[in-house]
Amino acid sequence: EFDIGAIPVGQEITVKWRGKPIFIRHRSEEEIAEAESVDVSSLPDPQPDDARVIAGPGGELEKQWLIVVGICTHLGCVPLSYRGEYDGYFCPCHGSVYDTSGRIRKGPAPLNLEVPPYEFVSDTRIKIG
């Protein structure tokens, strides 16, 4: 379990799960709006933002929380946060660019950053796995 209550809006922490980095990002309203405004059919790995977040204890989608495995889907490098032209993630190894929803936008990566299985155990705690 991880406490996410202290992560400020617009910030991110990295935790380890099964030896992998997990990015836990507290998205701003602007980041959410940007992710929702994308024409999903134009994406290499089409997936709406709502499919990349889950409902919290109250049953509402917790759109402010993006939780992804921090491993590029190209060759396994660790992307840099808040980088690239979409303010999401940038992989320094081969130039893949992900948006604020962790979706691949440019570069050689074939898939979006993976969303691990997780659940909210309270308003401020998540359990991964």
Q: Which sequence ranges carry the predicted segments?
A:
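C-terminal segment of N-terminal export signals and the immediately downstream linker at the start
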Residues: 1-20
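Short, surface-exposed charged micro-motifs
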Residues: 14, 23, 117
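Structured loops at beta-to-helix junctions and adjacent beta-edge loops in soluble globular domains
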Residues: 18, 25-27, 70
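Short hydrophobic-aromatic micro-motifs
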Residues: 22-25, 128
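Residue-level structural signal for beta-strand termini and adjacent loop
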Residues: 27-28, 110
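Short, surface-exposed beta-strand-loop junctions and turns on beta-sheet-rich folds
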Residues: 30-32
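Rieske [2Fe-2S] iron-sulfur-binding domain
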Residues: 34-129
